[in-house]
């Protein structure tokens, strides 16, 4: 098991377009901003990112966008505890893990 870096992990907000869609270009810019400011890692999918209001597809794409943008320069953490059944929860864990995040927070 690989350990994630110790340090500062801000909880990331989710920027939206005027149409109420996730603004993935802004997500990439925000990720770069956190890295430029010296953060050790980013908590990408969390309560601050309004994860409870995002679909599974949006949560997965958000985690993937941050992970791809960070490209190993910082650790990326995601959370996933929005599912209502155990099978849905397992699916969420698998899909977010497949994005390459460095750590996953699961609240049961």
Where are these regions (language model features)?
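Active-site beta->alpha loop and helix N-cap motifs at the rims of alpha/beta catalytic domains
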Residues: 2-10, 14-108
């Amino acid at each position: 098991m690989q350990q994630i870096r110790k340090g500062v992990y801000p909880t990331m907000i989710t920027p939206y377009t005027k149409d109420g869609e996730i603004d993935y270009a802004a997500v990439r810019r925000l990720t770069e901003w956190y890295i430029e400011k010296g953060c050790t890692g980013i908590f990408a999918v969390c309560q601050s990112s309004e994860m409870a209001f995002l679909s599974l597809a949006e949560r997965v794409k958000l985690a993937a966008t941050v992970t791809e943008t960070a490209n190993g320069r910082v650790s990326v953490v995601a959370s996933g505890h929005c599912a209502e059944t155990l099978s849905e929860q397992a699916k969420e864990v698998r899909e977010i893990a497949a994005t390459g995040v460095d750590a996953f927070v699961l609240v049961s």
